[in-house]
Amino acid sequence: EILRCLVGSEMCIRDRVYVVKGQLSWGHCLKIFDASEEHELGTVKEQIFSWWPQFELYEGSDCIGTLKKEPWGWFKPRYNIDFNGWHIEGDWTEWDYTITGPDGEKVAAISKELLHWTDTYVLDIADPEDALYVLMFVLAIDAEKCSRN
């Protein structure tokens, strides 16, 4: 399943649309809604009191996972995901990432498209049930990259 994703706008997955809204706060706080914008599906919150960038992912009030930037990724970004045994690997350009499951199976491939006015990512997600979670991690990575620039 392919998701063409305009970060900061609408995210379309087949017949589903996610709307992302940022909140004014210390650190990034991104809320994900369904297309009607009536039902909040998830939240990505930056933890500001940590040595290295760290984001917590929430469904309702429950923290379901974290993404941490590892400090010593000299030639390519290194992130640590604490969610369902997932692992993420990125390339040195910080445009392409692969998320794998605990047995090494591909959960998602993420690639950034160039020549767009906004950050645009294409997400190839193996299981549609993981779409929201993959989107949350992509938003966290994009927010971390924005904080550096």
Can you describe what each PLM-predicted range is?
Residues 1-7, 13:
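Single conserved hydrophobic/aromatic residue that forms the stacking wall/gate
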Residues 8-10, 32, 99:
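Beta-strand-rich structural segments
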Residues 11-12, 19, 43-45, 104:
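Generic N-terminal leader/processing signal
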Residues 14-26, 30:
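A positional/architectural concept
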Residues 8, 28, 94-95:
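Short loop/turn microsegments at loop-to-beta-strand junctions
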